A protein has these predicted regions:
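Solvent-exposed, amphipathic alpha-helical "stalk/arm" or coiled-coil-like segments used as scaffolds
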Residues: 86-109, 128-199
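Hydrophobic transmembrane alpha-helix bundles
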Residues: 116-127, 149-162, 207-225
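Alpha-helical structural motif
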Residues: 32, 61, 122, 158, ...
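Short, low-structural-confidence N-terminal segments
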Residues: 1-86, 184-227
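N-terminal targeting/tethering segments
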Residues: 45-144
Length: 227
């Protein structure tokens, strides 16, 4: 099972086991603080109208990341154990956004992008199982903002459709193996640029990682920013 088909247990709210379709674990980045912005003032992407990430022609701004991050916190149940360190949470969330753009591009190529109706049907099933408020809490415990649920479902469904297109009737392992090279290919074709304050893009492993020169904002800095 590839990283775009995440299932499992999440802590909090009674550690309910969730099998939410094939939810992509998506953790949105915490907005960089003024001190970090000053530190990285000369970096190229940060000059592109406040972009946190640019993937092809798509972009997400730092303010959009901040809004999604805050909405995740607001949706967490009272007994939640939290989402981990800001650095870990933010990086994984940003990576999920990158995946959503890449998977959508592959879906367009193969003519199998999940439709609004398919996304709505998948969400309706989840809301029937967990209730509307319950789904928001389950998603938040996976660091998925309420506004990002449909995006996450579309990515998950499109990934599934592409997998079936590439290896009809194949096992999950066979389909994941077929999609892996496509993810790398399309990531390179689109181009992924991460604002250095958040890290850098590893094109071979298709992950967001620390900058080799240490320019990405440290966990301590993010914690200090939260006050």
């Amino acid at each position: 099972m590839g990283p775009w088909r995440a299932e499992g247990d999440y802590t909090g709210y009674g550690r309910r086991k969730i099998l939410v379709g094939e939810f992509v674990k998506s953790i949105l980045k915490f907005v960089a603080v003024a001190a970090a912005a000053l530190l990285l003032a000369g970096c190229s992407l940060t000059e592109k109208a406040g972009a946190a990430v640019v993937v092809g022609t798509e972009r997400m701004s730092s303010s959009e990341l901040a809004a999604e991050y805050q909405s995740v916190l607001d949706a967490l149940p009272a007994d939640s154990q939290g989402l981990g360190s800001p650095t870990q949470v933010n990086r994984t969330i940003l990576q999920s956004y990158v995946y959503s753009v890449i998977v959508n591009a592959i879906g367009v190529e193969y003519g199998v992008v999940a439709t609004d109706a398919q996304v709505a049907a998948e969400r309706a099933t989840l809301e029937k199982n967990y209730g509307k408020d319950g789904l928001l809490e389950v998603a938040a415990q996976g660091a998925i903002a309420p506004s990002a649920i449909d995006r996450t479902l579309r990515t998950s469904l499109t990934y599934r459709y592409v997998a079936e297109k590439l290896v009809p009737g194949g096992t999950t392992e066979e389909q994941d193996a077929a999609i892996g090279p496509k993810l790398i290919e399309f990531a390179k074709k689109l181009g992924v640029e991460i604002a250095p304050r958040y890290g850098q893009w590893n094109a071979e492993n298709i992950v967001v990682e620390d900058l080799a020169d240490g320019l990405s904002v440290s966990q301590d800095a993010l914690l200090a920013a939260q006050g």
